[in-house]
UniProtKB/Swiss-Prot annotation:
It comes from Homo sapiens. It is an enzyme of class 3 (hydrolase). Belongs to the glycerophosphoryl diester phosphodiesterase family. The chain crosses the membrane at residues 3-23, 199-221. The keyword Cytoplasm applies. Its EC number is 3.1.4.-. One of its GO terms (cellular component) is endoplasmic reticulum. Widely expressed, with high level in kidney and ovary. Residues 24-198 are extracellular. This is Lysophospholipase D GDPD3.
Length: 318
């Protein structure tokens, strides 16, 4: 045992020192990647706290606030039209208990006159525009605006249609593939490998594990965006579990694991933009930028724009 310790302890010490050294200097092992665009202000569902989610009116409002990114979810209609909709089932959005895929685009119902803001419980958005929009409409209206397109399920036809639209409108570098599932992301990458990738849940866990094991400086990272929930919002505006105690436990553990300046700085220097969602209060904006986040995704782009304009360069510290 003593002989094992004699060799193991120096080896572990050397490994730890090397890991810390390269964690702080990733450019010595990896070629820095210059971003095509940077996300400071991302509009969740087009800014669903100010106007009805995913409508053209909401998108226009977000762009008036100089949003850097429109965060979208897409579904496929029966006649193979890619529409911007968070839910597959239309009941919450319109009151009609039908799936998007069971209707042609022209038969899709209007949104309700008001919709509750998911990450601001008790708050409702209204708007004069209640029509669902096609993804192609947004590509035509905002040809050079970066967008994140999240795929919820394993709908290969939807993935192919989106990949084709991105190519047709020459948006390969400014349209991000997003999905929670690695199996779905694999299909997205195969359909259009030129589009930048965001982390899936399992890949995010792998990065955290690698960071705490000291492996992160030595492994390749193909993703360019790390979209992550801010632990501060758990049990306040975000309730992943029905049990309050579990939510509180997750808030404490995830805050300890994720809110690390050295982790975020390393990812940034590797060309990975760290963007926290879905933050709707100034205290949360402050929490995200204080640990060095690239940007924030919000339901209230006007509030975030006001914060960024008032804080200037100080909104991002490292």
């Amino acid at each position: 045992m003593s002989l094992l310790l004699y060799y193991a302890l120096p080896a572990l010490g050397s490994y730890a020192m090397l890991s810390i050294f390269f964690l702080r200097r990733p450019h010595l092992l990896h070629t820095p990647r210059a971003p095509t665009f940077r996300i400071r202000l991302g509009a969740h569902r087009g800014g669903s706290g100010e106007l009805l989610e995913n409508t053209m009116e909401a998108m226009e409002n977000s762009m008036a606030q100089r949003s850097d990114l429109l965060e979208l979810d897409c579904q496929l209609t029966r006649d193979r039209v890619v529409v911007v909709s968070h839910d597959e089932n239309l009941c919450r959005q319109s009151g009609l208990n039908r799936d998007v895929g069971s209707l042609d685009f022209e038969d899709l119902p209007l949104y309700k006159e008001k919709l509750e803001v998911y990450f601001s419980p008790g708050h409702f958005a209204h708007g004069s525009d209640r029509r669902m929009v096609r993804l192609e409409d947004l590509f035509q209206r905002f040809p050079r605006t970066p967008m994140s397109v999240e795929i919820k399920g394993k709908n290969e036809e939807l993935i192919r249609e989106i990949a084709g639209l991105v190519r047709r409108y020459d948006r390969n570098e400014i349209t991000i593939w997003a999905s929670e599932k690695s199996s779905v992301m694999k299909k997205c990458k195969a359909a259009n490998p030129e589009m930048p990738l965001s982390f899936t849940i399992s890949r995010g866990f792998w990065v955290l594990l690698s960071y705490y094991l000291g492996l992160l400086p030595f492994i390749p990272i193909p993703e360019k965006f790390f979209f992550c929930f801010l632990p501060n919002i758990i049990n306040r505006t975000y309730f992943p579990f029905s049990c309050s105690c579990l939510n509180q436990l997750l808030a404490v553990v995830s805050k300890w694991l994720i809110m690390r300046k050295s982790l975020i700085r390393h990812l940034e220097e590797r060309g990975v933009q760290v963007v926290f969602w879905c933050l709707n209060e100034e205290s949360d904006f402050e929490a995200a930028f204080s640990v060095g986040a690239t940007g924030v995704i919000t339901d209230y782009p006007t509030a975030l724009r006001h914060y960024l304009d008032n804080h200037g360069p100080a909104a991002r510290t490292s």
